[in-house]
Amino acid sequence: YRQRQGCRDMELRDCYAEFGGDYKEVLGRLEREQTVQKFVLKFLDDKSFSSLETALQNRNYEEALRFVHTLEGICRNLSFTRLYESSSRMTEAFKAGDFENAAAGMPQLSDDYHQIIRAVEAYKTCREG
């Protein structure tokens, strides 16, 4: 993001545009930009993704379902549209007992997740200074 625009110009809506989220929707849900910002920044510390990776590596599909479902809920609440969609597909596959198809969704989910992390970290860096 920094290459395309000046860091000081980066707003939370720009961050959402960067990773394919719905800023207008989340602002309608949470009502204040400060509230949205608080929860978006807290997402950087959420362990659902790393726990999901570990559960998949250990072939613990019950735990994987729990973590991907948690991630799906967070993404729905924060209007992280792309990551919500990929986590929702994985959740449904796990619930259907289709573990192979669920695990096959991990590369897309990982890409979507890391795109959010990069954008939010850039936003955080810009805000700090």
Go through the PLM ranges and name each one.
Residues 1-66, 70-129:
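Two-component system phosphorelay core
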